[in-house]
């Protein structure tokens, strides 16, 4: 299978339970909930999306003919340090492209594999860390994993709709944009009132890293 990658870069994970951890981010092109075109944003399941996932023209992006080639590019992006290799497959929606062949190839390079998914598609076996981020009314089929991270507030995706799912960690992440301060205040109060939930901030945006 060929893979279309918007961008490939090394940075620190900025969000959730793995915040602060060095990681290679492999951002796949494409999403099943929005085309990525501004003209279509109003009809998207997540009108608040702040990610460019269209095309393959980003840093380190491109079309990769097979799993081995993409795994080699991920390893090269990580660099010479052999320990604690960690790759995050994201998007767009990574489960449109992530398959068992690619998982096997990056595992063979010594990586722990994480995904950040909207949870609407079933994952292949072998993923080490599953983070689901529900979007609007889009039905979630991934009902167990390591981390559920909900952008908050969403009128069509309330925290109580997901609190019963089998995840180890539950995070509220204040929605970015002009009302971020108000959203943060709301998220803080919700976490205080519902201690099952923890606050996740996009620390990479605060410290100016990708």
Swiss-Prot record:
Mg(2+) binds at residue 51. Gene3D superfamilies: Aldolase class I. Its cofactor is [4Fe-4S] cluster; S-adenosyl-L-methionine; Mg(2+). [4Fe-4S] cluster binds at residues 31, 46, 49. Signal peptide: none annotated. Residues 18-210 form the Radical SAM core domain. S-adenosyl-L-methionine binds at residues 92, 133-135, 173-176. Disulfide bonds: none annotated. Pathway: Purine metabolism; 7-cyano-7-deazaguanine biosynthesis. GO terms for biological process: queuosine biosynthetic process. Belongs to the radical SAM superfamily. 7-carboxy-7-deazaguanine synthase family. Catalyzes the complex heterocyclic radical-mediated conversion of 6-carboxy-5,6,7,8-tetrahydropterin (CPH4) to 7-carboxy-7-deazaguanine (CDG), a step common to the biosynthetic pathways of all 7-deazapurine-containing compounds. This is 7-carboxy-7-deazaguanine synthase. Its EC number is 4.3.99.3. It comes from Bordetella pertussis (strain Tohama I / ATCC BAA-589 / NCTC 13251). GO terms for molecular function: 4 iron, 4 sulfur cluster binding; carbon-nitrogen lyase activity; magnesium ion binding; S-adenosyl-L-methionine binding. Keywords: 4Fe-4S, Iron, Iron-sulfur, Lyase, Magnesium, Metal-binding, Queuosine biosynthesis, S-adenosyl-L-methionine. Homodimer. Substrate binds at residues 12-14, 27, 90, 210. Binds 1 [4Fe-4S] cluster. The cluster is coordinated with 3 cysteines and an exchangeable S-adenosyl-L-methionine. It is an enzyme of class 4 (lyase). It catalyses: 6-carboxy-5,6,7,8-tetrahydropterin + H(+) = 7-carboxy-7-deazaguanine + NH4(+).
């Amino acid at each position: 299978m060929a893979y279309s990658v918007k961008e490939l870069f090394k940075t620190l994970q900025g969000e959730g339970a793995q915040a602060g951890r060095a990681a290679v981010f492999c951002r796949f092109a494409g999403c099943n909930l929005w085309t990525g075109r501004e003209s279509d944003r109003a009809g998207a399941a997540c009108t608040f999306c702040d990610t460019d996932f269209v095309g393959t023209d980003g840093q380190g992006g491109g079309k990769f003919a097979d799993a081995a080639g993409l795994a080699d590019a991920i390893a090269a992006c990580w660099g010479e340090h052999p320990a604690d290799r960690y790759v995050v497959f994201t998007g767009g929606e990574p489960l449109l492209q992530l398959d068992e062949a690619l998982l096997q190839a990056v595992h063979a390079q010594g990586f722990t594999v994480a995904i950040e998914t909207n949870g609407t598609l079933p994952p292949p076996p072998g993923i080490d860390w599953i983070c689901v981020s529900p979007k609007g009314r889009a039905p979630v089929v991934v009902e167990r994993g390591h981390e559920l991270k909900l952008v908050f507030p969403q009128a069509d995706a309330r925290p109580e709709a997901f609190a019963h799912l089998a995840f180890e960690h539950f995070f509220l992440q204040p929605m970015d944009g002009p009302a971020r301060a108000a959203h943060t205040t709301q998220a803080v109060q919700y976490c205080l009132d519902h201690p099952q939930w923890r606050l996740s901030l996009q620390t990479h945006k605060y410290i100016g890293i990708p």
